[in-house]
Amino acid sequence: MTQYRGGYIASCYAQALFSVSDVNSICKDVEFVISVLENDNNVAMFLSSPRVSKESKISLIKVIGDYIDSILVKFMIIVIESNRGNILLQIFSAFLDLVRKYNKEVNISVTSCALLTKQEEEGICNALLERYGKVVGITNNLDPSILGGFIIRVNFDVIDVSLNSYLQSLRELSKMSVCSISE
């Protein structure tokens, strides 16, 4: 329950940042802050700790503020003043998801029995462009059990054109045909 609530709160803050900022100019700054929080555990723990005073946290943000957009600095101060420093990373990840959605950019996962070539990746990206938007990232997962073809996952959609799936469909059709003949 706490995680879901934190996710909901993070998405509300992300939506607020999205609505007040120039999305394209602030995106790099958000990525910078994410990298700082992910790569320096001390900074993340400092901003998350309930034992550290808000004033100390705000001082740190102002130091980082020399390198990032002023709107982002003010936003981070509001988050800290609201005792939400522990979800800053979630907020910024949700913000980047909103930016990708706004720019019609998607990350896809492709499961295949062999690594995709650059040409195959480009073909898949071009095929998905009209329906989903620009593909900005491809994760190629290997699974020899699919025998051939591939399975694409985009957001919550699954496009399964694997040989294993095709053979299962044929198996089901043949079972139905045998059942209808025996009747």
From Swiss-Prot:
<keyword id="KW-0472">Membrane</keyword>
<dbReference type="GO" id="GO:0005886">
    <property type="term" value="C:plasma membrane"/>
</dbReference>
<keyword id="KW-1003">Cell membrane</keyword>
<comment type="similarity">
    <text>Belongs to the ATPase delta chain family.</text>
</comment>
<dbReference type="InterPro" id="IPR000711">
    <property type="entry name" value="ATPase_OSCP/dsu"/>
</dbReference>
<dbReference type="Pfam" id="PF00213">
    <property type="entry name" value="OSCP"/>
</dbReference>
<keyword id="KW-0375">Hydrogen ion transport</keyword>
<dbReference type="GO" id="GO:0046933">
    <property type="term" value="F:proton-transporting ATP synthase activity, rotational mechanism"/>
</dbReference>
<dbReference type="GO" id="GO:0045259">
    <property type="term" value="C:proton-transporting ATP synthase complex"/>
</dbReference>
<comment type="function">
    <text>This protein is part of the stalk that links CF(0) to CF(1). It either transmits conformational changes from CF(0) to CF(1) or is implicated in proton conduction.</text>
</comment>
<dbReference type="InterPro" id="IPR020781">
    <property type="entry name" value="ATPase_OSCP/d_CS"/>
</dbReference>
<keyword id="KW-0813">Transport</keyword>
<comment type="subunit">
    <text>F-type ATPases have 2 components, F(1) - the catalytic core - and F(0) - the membrane proton channel. F(1) has five subunits: alpha(3), beta(3), gamma(1), delta(1), epsilon(1). F(0) has three main subunits: a(1), b(2) and c(10-14). The alpha and beta chains form an alternating ring which encloses part of the gamma chain. F(1) is attached to F(0) by a central stalk formed by the gamma and epsilon chains, while a peripheral stalk is formed by the delta and b chains.</text>
</comment>
<protein>
    <recommendedName>
        <fullName>ATP synthase subunit delta</fullName>
    </recommendedName>
</protein>
<keyword id="KW-0139">CF(1)</keyword>
<keyword id="KW-0406">Ion transport</keyword>
<keyword id="KW-0997">Cell inner membrane</keyword>
<keyword id="KW-0066">ATP synthesis</keyword>
<dbReference type="InterPro" id="IPR026015">
    <property type="entry name" value="ATP_synth_OSCP/delta_N_sf"/>
</dbReference>
<comment type="function">
    <text>F(1)F(0) ATP synthase produces ATP from ADP in the presence of a proton or sodium gradient. F-type ATPases consist of two structural domains, F(1) containing the extramembraneous catalytic core and F(0) containing the membrane proton channel, linked together by a central stalk and a peripheral stalk. During catalysis, ATP synthesis in the catalytic domain of F(1) is coupled via a rotary mechanism of the central stalk subunits to proton translocation.</text>
</comment>
